UniProtKB/Swiss-Prot annotation:
Residues found modified as Phosphoserine: 74, 102, 114, 140, 176, 192, 272
Known partners and oligomeric status: Part of a ternary complex containing STX5A, NSFL1C and VCP. NSFL1C forms a homotrimer that binds to one end of a VCP homohexamer. The complex binds to membranes enriched in phosphatidylethanolamine-containing lipids and promotes Golgi membrane fusion. Interaction with VCIP135 leads to dissociation of the complex via ATP hydrolysis by VCP. Binds ubiquitin and mono-ubiquitinated proteins via its N-terminal UBA-like domain when bound to VCP.
Description of post-translational modifications: Phosphorylated during mitosis. Phosphorylation inhibits interaction with Golgi membranes and is required for the fragmentation of the Golgi stacks during mitosis.
Protein name per its UniProtKB record: NSFL1 cofactor p47
Disulfide bond positions: none
Sequence motif Nuclear localization signal, location on chain: 109-115, 172-175
Organism: Homo sapiens (Human)
Gene that this sequence comes from: NSFL1C
GO terms under biological process: autophagosome assembly; establishment of mitotic spindle orientation; Golgi organization; membrane fusion; negative regulation of protein localization to centrosome; nuclear membrane reassembly; positive regulation of mitotic centrosome separation; proteasome-mediated ubiquitin-dependent protein catabolic process
Length: 370
């Protein structure tokens, strides 16, 4: 192996006339392939673009110091150093034999951008395509709001004294019912739409959405929401914050319930006013009044909030009042209730008593559900 390398070195020097150290440099760079080394030598311009940088020997160094090594560098190496920053973005480069021109170059996968760089690209791309920065929505204490243009009607003054002023109606802005306003919030680890869930920057399903934002376009999924209307998209920068899911808006209870306080709450069906009036008239006609006997008027306060007034004879019994209530409110037939006086508050338990015996002449009776 050593003999083959020595033979290649001699041939390289014989062909190019270069010094042995320089010949060895090109052969080592080409993996000791003579043809590749010669091609690299002539492509680099031979003697014209080779600079030998020798390390100066300090005067204070003694004779016993080991001789310094020479480093041979081409101008191409200097250019390569200037391009290192660009190569970092493109991916790491690998060389499989030969020089930069004659060998095979392999470029690795591009370096992934951090979320901070990704957000920068989104804002930069949006601005390049016409997006503008707006003031924050919230105002500090004492901060005045921006004036809004007048949108009402007014009077156009006449151009001459004899011309009368004319009223001019203001033009109303037409807003489509399909217009959509969306807030895109860019967080440290992802993005969200309005008060929605966090969506990752690295999720492939979100790549098309983010690319549309970077190009200054409205993403397709937002256009579908508008159904042909206008989409207003606001972008908020929260890249230094972790995603926090907003609290849901308070919703008042809209269901049904029962009022506390009654021993056995019941739901009573109500009829239409016309049907109710018909039932009350039928109930009143069912009470037979003997005009030759003394009469009295009884006021009845019903459990459903209604009020009935009926004429009775003194000889009518409390049970007749119960029947009258059931006829006036047929829904009460299947409901358990009692009758009570208002003052003093006492239950009328013995319904066989007459109104006179129970001292209910011209009285007020209350119905209570049980």
């Amino acid at each position: 192996m050593a003999a083959e390398r020595q033979e290649a070195l001699r041939e390289f020097v014989a062909v190019t006339g270069a010094e042995e150290d320089r010949a060895r440099f090109f052969l080592e760079s080409a993996g000791w392939d003579l043809q590749i080394a010669l091609a690299s030598f002539y492509e680099d311009g031979g003697d014209e673009d080779i600079v030998t940088i020798s390390q100066a020997t300090p005067s204070s160094v003694s004779r016993g110091t080991a001789p310094s090594d020479n480093r041979v560098t081409s101008f191409r190496d200097l250019i390569h150093d200037q391009d290192e920053d660009e190569e970092e973005e493109e991916g790491q480069r690998f060389y499989a034999g030969g020089s930069e021109r004659s060998g095979q170059q392999i470029v690795g996968p591009p370096r992934k951008k951090s979320p901070n760089e990704l957000v920068d690209d989104l804002f930069k791309g949006a601005k390049e395509h016409g997006a503008v920065a707006v003031e924050r929505v919230t105002k500090s204490p004492g901060e005045t709001s921006k004036p809004r243009p007048f949108a009402g009607g007014g009077y156009r003054l006449g151009a001459a004294p004899e011309e009368e002023s004319a009223y001019v109606a203001g033009e109303k802005r037409q807003h489509s019912s399909q217009d959509v306003h969306v807030v895109l919030k860019l967080w440290k680890s992802g993005f969200s739409l309005d008060n929605g869930e966090l969506r990752s920057y690295q999720d492939p399903s979100n790549a098309q959405f983010l690319e549309s934002i970077r190009r200054g376009e409205v993403p397709a999924e937002l256009r579908r929401l508008a159904h042909g209307g206008q989409v207003n998209l606001d972008m908020e920068d929260h890249r230094d914050e972790d995603f926090v899911k907003p609290k849901g808006a308070f919703k008042a209870f809209t269901g049904e319930g029962q009022k506390l306080g009654s021993t056995a709450p019941q739901v009573l069906s109500t009829s239409s006013p016309a049907q109710q009036a018909e039932n009350e008239a039928k109930a009143s006609s069912s009470i037979l009044i003997d005009e030759s006997e003394p009469t009295t008027n009884i006021q009845i306060r019903l459990a459903d909030g209604g009020r009935l007034v009926q004429k009775f004879n003194h000889s009518h019994r409390i049970s007749d009042i119960r029947l009258f209530i059931v006829d006036a409110r047929p829904a009460m037939a299947a409901t358990s209730f009692i009758l009570m006086t208002t003052f003093p508050n006492k239950e009328l338990a013995d319904e066989s008593q007459t109104l006179k015996e129970a001292n209910l002449l011209n009285a007020v009776i209350v119905q209570r559900l049980t």
